[in-house]
Each structure stands twice: as C-alpha cells, then as structure tokens.
C-alpha cells in the first residue's frame, strides 16, 4: 500500500479518571508519555491568578473545555484528567466517537472516600492543591456512579484499577464497547457493582 492508500489511524482521546487523591496526575505521567497534549483543569486553575479558589476553579473548568474542544476540532490525540463527578463529558465523548475518535477510559479506584480525604490532606502537606472534604466525598460517590451508569457504556475501551496500595495500580476489570467484561479481581469488581450499579 502506498502512504495515501494506508488506512487513516483514528485520533485517540484518553480519559484518566478517579476520585480526588486517587493518583490521577501521578499515573498520567507514566501512562501518557506519548501524549503531547494533556489537559488538566487542576493545573489550569493553579495558573489562574487574581481569583479566589472557587473563581479559579470555574475559570479553569471553562478553559479546560475550550482546550479539549480545540484539540478535537484539530483531530489531535489528547488526554484529560477528571473525577467523572458530572456528566459534562458524556455528550462530548459521543461526539468525539462520531467524529472518528477512539476514546479510552482509565479509572483509578480507591476503596473509600476516607482514603481519598487522607490522600488529599497528604498532598496538601506536601505542597499540592487542596480540595474541600465535602467536595471530595461528593465527587467520590458521584464519580463511581457515573462511571458505571454513563461513561463505561459510551467509550471504546475502559479499565478500572485499584490504586489504593501506593505502588503499581492493580487491574480490577476491563472491557471494550459492547463486548464482554474481563474481570481480574472478582471480589473487588463484585463489590463495585453491588455498591454503584444497584
């Protein structure tokens, strides 16, 4: 095949998701070495000066969505980080897939909101950004519910990892759109389904 006869490689969108404190930013560095375009609302918020934290978060959310829309229009590969606590990405994911993107979801799970709160507190003591405890707890539950009810059904591939041990994440389960679920950790997977799918 000549270069012009070769099939076009579809653009890729990778979503690194999980509760606050789950290690999304840390894992992103290892997982996304090939992605030049990595969009992170927390990093955008840190760059916004002259605003309250709430004002910076709102501005960062707007800029985050603008950046990913620009990249999608340009059909560039990109990766983003999110808690999945809202359904704000759902329509975009459907549109990206309609536009020829392959969308991959990696979810970093923690077994409790308490652990998420502890990890964020540790991050703050180490100089990282803070998130109010009530927000961490709300996002923890909402993100897991949305993972199962909204996001797994609309992406091309997905993987859920246990990232509670502080070392390498442990694969719990994975799948492809409309395909079978491959379960690596049956007890953890069963617990997630019972808690967030019923």
Summary of predicted features, one role per range:
Residues 19-20:
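The conserved Walker
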Residues 7-14, 74-76:
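Pre-Walker A (Motif I) flank of P-loop NTPase domains
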Residues 1-7:
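Pre-Walker A adenine-sensing motif
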Residues 56-110, 143, 147, 151, ...:
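Glycine-rich phosphate-binding loop used to anchor ATP phosphates in small-molecule kinases
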Residues 23:
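Conserved glycine(s) of the Walker
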Residues 149-198:
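NTP-dependent small-molecule kinase module
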Residues 101-150:
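A glycine- and Lys/Arg-enriched "phosphate-lid" helix/loop adjacent to the NTP-binding pocket
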Residues 26-76:
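Conserved substrate/cofactor phosphate-moiety recognition/catalytic segment
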């Amino acid at each position: 095949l000549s270069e012009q006869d070769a099939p076009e490689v579809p653009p890729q969108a990778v979503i690194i998701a999980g509760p606050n404190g789950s290690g999304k930013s840390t894992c992103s560095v290892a997982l996304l070495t090939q992605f030049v375009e990595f969009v992170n609302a927390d990093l955008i918020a840190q760059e916004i000066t002259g605003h309250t934290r709430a004002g910076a978060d709102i501005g960062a959310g707007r800029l985050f969505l603008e950046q990913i829309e620009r990249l999608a229009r340009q059909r560039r590969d990109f990766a983003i980080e999110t808690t999945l606590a809202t359904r704000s990405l759902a329509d975009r994911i459907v549109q990206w897939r309609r536009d020829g993107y392959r969308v991959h979801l990696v979810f970093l799970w923690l077994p409790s909101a308490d652990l998420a709160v502890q990890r964020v507190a540790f991050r703050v003591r180490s100089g990282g950004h803070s998130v109010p405890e009530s927000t961490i707890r709300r996002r923890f539950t909402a993100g897991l519910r949305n993972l199962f009810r909204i996001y797994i059904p609309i992406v091309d591939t997905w993987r859920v990892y246990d990232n509670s041990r502080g070392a390498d994440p442990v694969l719990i389960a994975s799948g492809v759109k409309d395909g079978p679920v491959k379960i690596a950790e049956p007890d953890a997977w069963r617990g997630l389904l019972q808690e967030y799918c019923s």
